[in-house]
A protein has these predicted regions:
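C-terminal TM-helix exit segments that contain a strictly Trp-centered aromatic cap at the helix terminus
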Residues: 27-34, 80-96
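Cytosolic juxtamembrane helix and N-cap/initiation of the first transmembrane helix
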Residues: 1-23, 153-154
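Membrane-interface helix termini and inter-helical loops of multi-pass transporters
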Residues: 33-38, 95-105
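Alpha-helical transmembrane segments in multipass membrane proteins, preferentially the mid-helix core
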Residues: 55-65, 123-126
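Transmembrane alpha-helix entry/boundary detector in multi-pass membrane proteins
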Residues: 12-16, 31-52
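Individual transmembrane alpha-helices with interfacial aromatic-anchor signatures
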Residues: 102-122
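Membrane-interface capping segments at transmembrane-helix boundaries
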Residues: 127-141
């Protein structure tokens, strides 16, 4: 399969994209309200809610776009999402004073049915499934690296 043929937003991937889109909308709405109305209550928590919203938007767009570039961007965004939800989730339990108000990722996304905790792993699984078995083409290899069998591919 050529790089442009990586399809992350088709088949069951449509569900993954839809869930990311819903979470992107929810996180964006929540963070806008928190930052514009209550910022002084919990600035760190609210900024992290806004960061989560941006990450969900990037992941949604990249998953929907597909292709080799879309898959790489989605993988990066989802890895950041996973680290973020695990870090913020842990900190919200061990240092609750840092998170005096609820955010998307606090308590591992308890306010969202723990979807923020599960979603990055579902997203990474889907990306792996969508890109596995894809033939490596010259476009995927670093400069100067020929095919495994040599210049003629034999």
């Amino acid at each position: 399969m050529a790089p442009a043929e990586v399809r992350t937003g088709t088949g069951p991937g449509r569900i993954v994209v839809a869930v990311y889109a819903v979470l992107a909308l929810a996180a964006t709405g929540r963070s806008i309200l928190q930052v514009t109305s209550y910022f002084e209550r919990a600035p760190l928590a609210y900024v992290l809610s806004a960061v989560a919203a941006v990450i969900y938007i990037v992941a949604t767009a990249a998953l929907a776009k597909g292709g080799a570039v879309g898959a790489r961007v989605a993988t990066g965004a989802i890895l950041i999402e996973a680290v973020g939800v695990l870090t913020v989730g842990t900190l919200s339990f061990v240092q609750p004073d840092l998170f005096p108000d609820k955010t998307v990722w606090s308590h591992f996304g308890a306010g969202y049915g723990y979807l923020p905790l599960v979603l990055p792993f579902v997203g990474l699984w889907w990306l792996h499934r969508a890109t596995r078995g894809r033939a490596t083409t010259a476009d995927d290899r670093p400069p100067g690296v020929s095919s495994p069998g040599g210049p003629d591919g034999a």
